[in-house]
Amino acid sequence: MSRLGIMVLTLLLLVFIVTSHQDAGEKQATHRGAINFRWRRSLIRRTATEECEEYCEDEEKTCCGLEDGEPVCATTCLG
């Protein structure tokens, strides 16, 4: 094989290695972003639940969740 052929094959191999390495980095970043989003969402939900419980506790009722961002209080929660 000529030197030119060896150089072309080496270049193709390098391009393949670099692109596969970049794809792996993007997948890892996407996965990390998904984990951060899940954690953030659970933190927001927990805070909203605590606020709902405090709000309903003042009315001596049970917090049944949030509806349109407003706490829903009742003596007995259905469903």
From Swiss-Prot:
Disulfide bridge partners, by residue number: 52-64, 56-73, 63-77
CC per GO annotation: extracellular region
Secretion signal span: 1-20
GO molecular function annotations of the record: ion channel inhibitor activity; toxin activity
Residues bearing PTM Leucine amide: 78
Location (main, coarse): secreted
InterPro entries assigned to the protein according to its UniProt record, in alphabetical order: Conotoxin
Propeptide stretches in the record: 21-44
Record localization: Secreted
The organism's place on the tree of life at top rank: Eukaryota
Tissue-specificity statement: Expressed by the venom duct.
Keywords: Amidation, Cleavage on pair of basic residues, Disulfide bond, Knottin, Neurotoxin, Secreted, Signal, Toxin
UniProt domain comment: The presence of a 'disulfide through disulfide knot' structurally defines this protein as a knottin. The cysteine framework is VI/VII (C-C-CC-C-C).
Family named by the database record: Belongs to the conotoxin O3 superfamily.
Protein name, as recorded: Conotoxin ArMSGL-021
Protein's organism: Conus arenatus (Sand-dusted cone)
